[in-house]
């Protein structure tokens, strides 16, 4: 649609590799501060103690784990939580974002999360963990459809589970360049076929557009970079046009000011 094209025009260039993608190789502590600032922006009076506890818990649980990029694993859940905060989601969802991988990738259990935090947060994390266990095979349409049905069922139980999973997938797509080419194609295709339609169904255009954009980047790189170039040119032309109008307005204002002073 025209709206999606305009949003893509504003965002696509900034997603390229030579531009800083979200929070790559930034210290965990600075990311945590960014997360808190983002939450307080839309919920100034929120009690951050639970978020802080979740951050420390996840940091301890993932200690020693490293992503393929070489950065500490805790960077990933922090970035997921920041994406959720940008969508202005509730504190429990932010906490679930921070903890979303501890059951799958560490020794921590759902029962421990329920005990340390709450049953509500434990259910969110458990839901995300179960979604992560769904397999996808692009060559088997029936399996793909079944995955979609399961995701819709999970969405019906608590939409926040899907929100965390979408944020998780978005950050993984933003850092997909560190994966093998085979993994890039598999993950990008899965994103295009499963996650983009879910984001569209939920009406989250911001996530849907970026997921579409990043999928195209790996599935059809020639088309993607051609689009990036065209958008960059179009944006440059538009900026020059706007600057020309501004310059004319400034010149006119100066001229009027000069004429006024001459009459005094």
Stretches found by the model and what they are:
Residues 1-256, 261:
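Active-site helical microenvironments for divalent-metal-assisted chemistry
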């Amino acid at each position: 649609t025209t709206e999606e094209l305009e949003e893509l025009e504003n965002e696509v260039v900034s997603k390229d590799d030579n531009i800083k993608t979200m929070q790559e190789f930034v210290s965990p502590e600075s990311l945590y501060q960014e997360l808190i600032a983002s939450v307080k922006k839309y919920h100034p009076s929120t009690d951050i103690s639970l978020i802080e506890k979740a951050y420390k818990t996840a940091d301890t649980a993932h200690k020693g784990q490293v992503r393929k990029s070489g950065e500490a694993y805790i960077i990933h859940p922090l970035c997921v939580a920041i994406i959720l905060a940008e969508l202005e989601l509730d504190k429990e969802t932010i906490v679930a974002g921070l903890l979303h991988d501890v059951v799958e990738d560490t020794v921590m259990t759902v029962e421990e999360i329920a005990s340390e935090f709450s049953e509500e947060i434990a259910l969110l994390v458990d839901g995300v963990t179960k979604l992560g266990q769904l397999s996808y095979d692009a060559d088997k349409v029936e399996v793909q459809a079944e995955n979609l049905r399961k995701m819709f069922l999970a969405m019906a139980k608590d939409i926040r589970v899907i929100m965390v999973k979408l944020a998780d997938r978005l950050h993984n797509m933003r850092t997909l360049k560190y994966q093998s080419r085979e993994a890039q194609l598999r993950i990008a295709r899965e994103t295009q076929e499963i996650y983009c339609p879910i984001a569209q169904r939920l009406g989250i255009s911001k996530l849907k557009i970026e997921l579409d954009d990043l999928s195209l980047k790996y599935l059809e790189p020639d088309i993607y970079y051609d689009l990036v170039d065209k958008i960059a040119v179009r944006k440059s032309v538009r900026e020059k046009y706007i600057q020309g109008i501004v310059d004319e307005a400034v010149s006119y204002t100066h001229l009027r000011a000069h004429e006024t002073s001459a009459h005094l």
